[in-house]
Amino acid sequence: GIVGHVNLLIGAEKTKSVLKSHLKEGGDLFKGIRHAGGWDHHYELSNSHHNPPKNLYSNETFLESLNELSNMNLSFEAWQYHHQVNQVRKIAETLPNLKIVLNHFSGPIGIGPYATKKEEIFEVWKTDILKLSKYENVYAKLGGMAMPINGYEFHKQASPTTSDQLIQAQEHYY
């Protein structure tokens, strides 16, 4: 299916209108939207590709727009950083009929100030993901853990990363 995008900060009514347009064009293939919320206060890190404001996933306008997705039985693909998992949990709790797809393992950061804290990050991530897993409206899409921000430096290799290399580096996340 097709996963599109709507800037959910435009408000519920405008979101509903844009979603109707997506449905008109995509028909049954249109399944929902993705809105990245990855934000971090460290200057050496980039925020996710939508350059979201801090606490996007708890913004009232954003949540009202998410409710429109839920009302239309469309999914919300969330991508945020490891320290924002609880924001997704609050969405799952607030909007229990909204189908939420967690992208990229919730973005464990492994560069900059987080480069030396990978084990600590994993333990917090594991606890937060376990809490999130209690919500039946949350699904996980595996992948996206080989990005430079994850700190594995696969992009610096001369040849493509193998499955064995991925498993060796990331097996505890699976």
Pin down the residues of each PLM region.
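Secondary-structure boundary/capping positions in well-ordered alpha/beta enzyme cores
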Residues: 29, 98-99, 139
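Helix C-cap/helix->beta junction micro-motif
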Residues: 72, 95-96, 135-136
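H/E-rich (His + Asp/Glu) clusters that bind or coordinate divalent metals
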Residues: 109-174
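Active-site gating/metal-coordination segments in enzymes
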Residues: 1-84, 90-93, 106, 120-121, ...
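Short acidic/histidine-rich active-site segments
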Residues: 100-104, 141-144
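Long amphipathic alpha-helical scaffold regions
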Residues: 94-97, 104-114
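A short acidic (Asp/Glu
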Residues: 14-15, 88-89, 113, 152-153
